[in-house]
């Protein structure tokens, strides 16, 4: 029970049945079907408030990529969050969810001409520019629109964030940002482009960071650049230090709090007059979400035991591509014996699994499992692979339930291909 509270304080067993915010997960599965994503509203609110308390003067821009459900983005926007976006679709969504453009920052190495045009036209707070060529293209677009685009340059501090290599973004070999040693040249170049207004510096070193010491190394370099640019007369209004705080996936993981990060950086930032921007995503949304899946079949092949469920890599791809661990527990616990099994989905690939060689309480066909820490990069990375409709999503708060995404059907998948 105590372990569950470390994942989400609103998660508990009552008489052997799993509840979240007073709502039975079994009843949710029976009402809405499976696979089903379930989110805890109070958890999301508390995580956002933890950032606001730790960084009271900062702009907290939620990383929309983590989970783009409009209801969840709207919830955060109403709390005062801005949006960290990386695509035209995320710009559209953030505005649709009520987040004003003056609280939107736009990163990403491959912004298209249309995406840049729409964002300039929307007059967003800041473009986090990733290359000199992007500076040129953005300047040209802003000129055609008769506007000035506010920019920061994303600098790459060459810091190892000690995370999975696929989500380490602050090392020299990664595709992101400009070499921090070359940054002053890029700022001087940008200052000569008449349709750009330099307002900030941006840095983001990676995701799922549990050891926060690399943040200090990165921010030291960024603050040094800030001081140098300020001395040269640049008016740096915003220091965007990105996101990336990790969450508890494995039972033994120790999750850093926003206050831990604030304490680590306090002395570095105390003389910085620029407004700080942070871009949390996973650390707000990750443990707010659970994926419920139903056991379809049990299968033994010699000494190998398989639990085959209806959620696959199309619903939650993190285990397949990152070899990521998600804690999985029965929705109904009956103090049965433990078995060691591969928990696998229905997709026609050997790489379709939620867990391998996992010790878990013995379950039967038709029962439900809860996959924890599924609120970030879960539905957001889902697909229609094997022609499977994507899951429904519900939001729970203090015993109430709201359907926030309908389950897709086959017509939804094929309709864009018909009558062409």
Swiss-Prot record:
One GO-annotated biological process of the protein: lysine biosynthetic process via diaminopimelate
InterPro entries annotated for this entry? Ala_racemase/Decarboxylase_C, DAP_deCOOHase_LysA, De-COase2_C, De-COase2_CS, De-COase2_N, De-COase2_pyr-phos_BS, Orn/DAP/Arg_de-COase, PLP-binding_barrel
Q: Which residues are listed for pyridoxal 5'-phosphate binding in this entry?
A: 244, 279-282, 377
Q: Which residues carry this modification: N6-(pyridoxal phosphate)lysine?
A: 65
Q: What class of enzyme is it?
A: lyase
The family classification in the record reads: Belongs to the Orn/Lys/Arg decarboxylase class-II family. LysA subfamily.
Q: What protein does this entry describe?
A: Diaminopimelate decarboxylase
């Amino acid at each position: 029970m105590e372990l569950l509270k470390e994942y989400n304080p609103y998660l508990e067993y009552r008489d052997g049945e799993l509840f979240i915010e007073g709502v039975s997960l079994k009843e949710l599965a029976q009402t809405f079907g499976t696979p089903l994503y379930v989110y805890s509203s109070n958890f999301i609110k508390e995580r956002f408030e933890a950032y606001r308390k730790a960084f009271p003067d900062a702009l907290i821009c939620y990383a929309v990529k983590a989970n783009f459900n409009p209801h969840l983005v709207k919830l955060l926007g109403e709390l005062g969050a801005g949006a960290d976006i990386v695509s035209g679709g995320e710009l559209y969504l953030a505005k649709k969810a009520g987040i004003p453009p003056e609280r939107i920052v736009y990163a990403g190495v491959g912004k298209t001409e249309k995406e840049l045009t729409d964002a300039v036209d929307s007059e967003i707070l800041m473009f986090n520019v990733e290359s000199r060529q992007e500076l040129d293209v953005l300047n040209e677009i802003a000129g055609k629109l008769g506007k000035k685009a506010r920019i920061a340059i994303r600098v790459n501090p060459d810091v190892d964030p000690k995370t999975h290599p696929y989500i380490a973004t602050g090392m020299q070999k990664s595709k992101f940002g400009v070499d921090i040693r070359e940054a002053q040249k890029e700022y001087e170049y940008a200052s000569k482009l008449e349709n750009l207004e330099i307002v900030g510096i941006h840095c983001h070193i990676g995701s799922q960071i549990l050891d926060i010491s690399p943040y200090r190394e990165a921010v030291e370099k960024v603050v040094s650049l800030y001081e140098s640019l300020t001395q040269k007369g640049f008016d740096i209004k915003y220091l965007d230090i990105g996101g990336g705080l990790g969450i508890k996936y494995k039972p033994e993981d120790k999750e850093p709090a926003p206050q831990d990060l604030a304490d680590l950086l306090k002395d570095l930032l105390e003389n910085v007059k620029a407004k700080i921007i942070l871009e949390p995503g996973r650390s707000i949304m990750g443990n707010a979400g659970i994926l419920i899946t139903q056991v379809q079949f049990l299968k033994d092949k010699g000494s190998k035991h398989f639990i085959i469920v209806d959620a696959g890599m199309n619903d939650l791809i993190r285990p397949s591509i990152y070899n990521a661990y998600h804690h999985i527990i029965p929705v109904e616990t009956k103090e049965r014996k433990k078995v060691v099994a591969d928990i696998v989905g229905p997709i026609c690939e050997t790489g379709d699994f939620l867990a391998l060689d996992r010790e878990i309480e013995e379950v039967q066909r038709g029962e439900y499992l809860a996959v924890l820490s599924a609120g970030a990069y879960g539905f957001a990375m889902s697909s229609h692979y094997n022609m499977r409709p994507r899951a429904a999503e519900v939001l729970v708060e203090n015993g109430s339930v709201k359907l926030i995404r309908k389950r897709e059907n086959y017509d939804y998948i094929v309709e864009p291909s018909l009558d062409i």
